[in-house]
Structures are given as structure tokens and as C-alpha cells.
Amino acid sequence: MEEEYGDRIRLHWRAFPLIPDEKPGRLATEKTQEGRRRVAAEEPRARFAPPAVGSGLPASSMPALVAAKCAERQSDAAFRRLHDSLFLAQFGDNLDIAQPELLWRLARESGLDMARFEQDYAAGDAYQVALTDYAEGTAWFGVSAVPAVIFNEKVSLVGAVPVERYRAILDWILAGEPGGLVPIPPDEAAAGATLPDAK
């Protein structure tokens, strides 16, 4: 979408920990597999590889979110490189992104200033920044799952939805929000689908 819309849109990533507390021993289930298969079918460019049933899952999402916040302090580009690496590691390669060794390797491979990254990570305040993102998302916008996208602090899409919904909302916003009603792509309107009302 960023490539398609260029500088007409600006994307700002916020942290939303799916597993804020440590939960060791998490294992992939058939539901995990099916969820990843569904997302992969929706967006073929995304690398979603279903994990084997019974394989390990990250014990917490916080270490990776903290690492991403530390990268963001270096630059938006540094954040995007690490974010993309973390995403691919977890969803494409089924690696445990809660493991410090993997986080450090991905940070190095993403070209981060490692001295600064290690200092920021050890300082601990990036953890609080990630929790603040989470609190704001739930309190202000009712976010309860990912992916969640908030458009102009008015409309939210939560969960894996077809890319056409994103386009419809972006086009509506860029056109000045005509009619005050959030649009529904024609094929979904015929099926009776609805989008959340503008807030």
C-alpha cells in the first residue's frame, strides 16, 4: 500500500504485544496453522509459513517489540529494516523472536548501530514505550488484536482483512471523506459485509 499510495499516506507503527507476559512452552496448534494459511492466501507477497503442529512459539512478544523500539530511536529506516526482519523470522521462518541471540543477530544484520542498540535495550525504557503504545491502542481505539490499522484516528480495521478494504478507506479519506460514511468495496457490500463506523 505504501508503494501504491506513495507520499499521500504516512504509516506509523505502534507496538501491540500479543503476549505481554512470559508464557513458556507455547506450542503451535492446528488453529495456528490455519490462521497462517488464511493470511498467506489473502496476501501472497507476505511470507507466512504455517508452523508444524507442536513446534515451539515465542514465549513473549515483548523482547521483539522492545528491540523494534530501540531500532526506531536510530531512524525510521532502521526500524523498518529490523521490523521486516523480525516479521519474516517469526512468520516466514518460524523462529523464536523472544530469544536474545536471535534479536541481536537480526539487529546486526539490519545494520543497526549495535553499541547504541545494546545501550538502549539495557536501559529498559523502550519496554515502557511499547506498553504505552499498547495502552493507547486499547484505550483510545479499542484494539484487541493484530493486525490493527487506525486511519486518521477515526476508522479502525482489526484482523486480517482483504487489501480492498484498506484501499477503499484510504481512497475515501484522500477524497475528503465524502458522505461521512465509510465505504464498503462492491463485492463485500453484495455479500452483506460492513466496516466499522467512523469514530
What spans do the regions from the language model cover?
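C-terminal cap of thioredoxin/glutaredoxin-like
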Residues: 1-5, 9, 85-199
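Structural alpha/beta surface segment adjacent to cysteine/selenocysteine redox centers
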Residues: 1-91, 99
